Amino acid sequence: PLFYTEPRLFEREAWRYDLQSADAPITITGTVYNEMKGAIDIYRAADYNLQNTLFPGSIIGSNSGGDPIAIPTLTYAELLNFHRTYYHPSNALVVLYGDLDLGRCLEMMDSYFSEYDRTEIDVPDGGVAPLSAPVNGRYEFPVEAGSDTSKGAVIGYGFVANGASREEIAGLNILTDLLSSDGSPVKDAVEKALPGAGFSVSVDMNFPQTRVTFQADGVDETDADTFRNAVNQGLAALVEDGVDRELILGIISAAQFSLRSITESSQIGPSLASLIASRWAVEGELDYLNFYSHTLEDMKDKAGRGWFVELAERYLLNNPHSGVAVTVPVAGLKEKQEADLAQRLADKKAAMSDTEIMALLQKTEDFAAWTAQEAPKSMVEALKAVTVQELPEELVDYPISDQTERGVRYLTAESQVSGIGFTGLALSLDTLPNEDLHWAALYAALLGKMKTETHTTAEVAARSARYLGSFYAGPSTIPEDGDHFRPVIMGQWIGMAEHYQ
């Protein structure tokens, strides 16, 4: 990398002292430093705070992007040492995707990797010993003076699933969707205890110890115990009463649909590589997508046999490795932190000699001149992996069938998405009087949101989740000759192929 021979890249991208004139104050700037000052809102801070509470003293609680307060403590030498240690082919995973010339790819990798010797790299995972009792943490978040901080706190209630298997972690992923859905006993208990509060449930599988988080926002610091008790009450009700099989099957189907539609991403190669690499880094396995696909199918048989209840009881309700972290906005703390930094920099300048001040001033001017230069053309050319002429021109021709039966026109086409179907249904409103069109729009909007003669509202929601990846019904128009349009009610849905049978 260029920063091995050009320290100014570290100063530009990480941080540096800046002095615009001999009488001006010293400031700190840098691309990452400036970005991270604006990147952390109270919700992101609350997540890191909960991690610090549940994983005391661990790197898991660190901000991977860099804490603005800590970034200026990073030295150029530390960056080089970190890169030499961990950015090594022995600690790398290469993912190839697409219609590639594998021979050319392997030659390129061999020419690069052959310069290195294989070595064992000890990568700390940040894991901690399971806690024997729940813990609590309180953290302050800086906001401007005069800010309204009432109902501005964020409460995180987390559980660490120590010893959970790959299958159980996948099950917790499904379970969190259930717990955050409308009608779940946990959500109902929280809404009753804290009316108007925001509520979410999530699972973090990015570390060796999986974490499940219940979060409330729009609350006060004093609501922490109320929130914890409400979550526990809801979990106890779920363990006592069990889970709705249809609802679980719906959530599993939604997960299967999402997995199958991953190929629809415009950045499918990078998306797959990132997903595979993230699971490899945690599990040491490369088969996550296949594993998850088969596991979701197996979960259907467990939906009505108490397996999800056992997960909730073992890893949530009766789990001692849990904790509550309260992140509280403090008005005026932002200005205080800025004033403290300005004072430290002023003290630093006061301790400098005139020679040191002039040296920093000259360094600032030299840096501005250097960074204004354009990159050499030779460097730009060296970064080009392919030429424009080598890029393929891909024109995909999708055969379309157009048939009419009994006055109904059917258009069908095949896609390259395995196991998923899309249906669009246009119902003409030609014979509906103009004054009644708004009623058609209203009725369409209510489709799937009300009970029927045979199903309750909850059952309709569960079946929709199970069989429909997405659903829309509403008014639309079809252009005809000239300025004329035909009003229609358009129904559109996406589902898995086996559910079309």
Please place each PLM-identified region on the residue numbering.
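Histidine-acidic residue clusters that define the catalytic metal-binding segment
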Residues: 36-43, 48-93, 162, 221-222, ...
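Structured mid-domain segments that build the active-site/substrate or prosthetic-cofactor binding neighborhood
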Residues: 155-246, 406-411, 415, 421-481
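Beta-sheet entry/capping signal
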Residues: 91-95, 154, 211-213, 322-324, ...
